[in-house]
Design a protein with these regions (language model features):
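A structural signal for conserved, well-ordered secondary-structure elements
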Residues: 2-223
Length: 223
């Protein structure tokens, strides 16, 4: 007799809840924050933790300030900055005083590189950033390419394989023909618990939505 359809493993609770809104674009700030903090139980979606002052070191701090404040707001942590110091109330989540400043200071530089080593696409070719689910129900960071990138794709050899990178971290290669069909890049969130994967996916989405920072930024003090 014919066997029945293969049963998929139970979907993690966070992924099941996330399916209600499978693609969350970062433009919908409240929704993205609720998904990140509420669904994954990563923390509370409002800034209700400790008040903190984060001092950044950077030669470009005047140019980076707007992006740093935007990243903080995307996390659900409205912030103000005076010079190099940001004042904000942290989200109510474990190790926030360590994790949040590190996230804010990440470069957020996208590179999509052709086999000869030359970059084909960068942050300027991003149309929209989202958190999505892959076929296994796990969170991924998804980028839609803009009209300029789509026009460029038409001129490339369909069999070329491109290497996507975020801040030098390499992700699975993608064939040009796939991008010609669907001009989207998907960045897997790695291994571990669904909540950890969701945090990685959301972190990457935040730094790409508000990036890259115009120079290297580091943390000099957190109080």
């Amino acid at each position: 007799p014919m066997s029945g359809p293969t049963k998929l493993p139970p979907r993690p609770k966070a992924a099941s809840l996330f399916m209600a809104v499978p693609i969350v674009f970062l433009g919908t700030l409240g929704l993205a924050v609720a998904i990140l903090f509420g669904v994954t139980r990563f923390g509370d979606q409002t800034a209700s933790g400790d008040q903190v002052s984060i001092t950044f070191g950077a030669s470009c701090i005047d140019d980076a300030r707007t992006q740093l404040i935007a990243r903080a707001g995307q996390i659900g942590m409205p912030a103000t900055m005076d010079g190099e110091t940001m004042t904000a109330t942290l989200p109510d989540m474990p190790d926030a005083a360590n994790l949040i400043p590190k996230l804010l200071a990440r470069q957020g530089r996208l590179s999509v590189i052709e086999p000869g080593g030359e970059p084909v696409f960068d942050n300027g070719h991003i149309d929209a950033v989202a958190i999505d689910l892959n076929e296994a129900g796990m969170p991924v960071t998804m980028l839609k390419l803009n009209a300029e990138a789509r026009a460029m794709l038409k001129t490339l050899d369909a069999d070329l394989e491109l290497q996507p990178e975020i801040d030098g971290e390499a992700f699975p290669k993608i064939r040009v023909s796939s991008l010609q069909d669907t001009p989207e890049l998907s960045f897997p969130s790695g291994e571990g618990k669904t909540s950890d994967r969701m945090k990685r996916a959301a972190d990457r989405a935040i730094i790409l939505e508000h990036g890259p920072l115009p120079c290297r930024v580091h943390i000099t003090n957190v109080t």
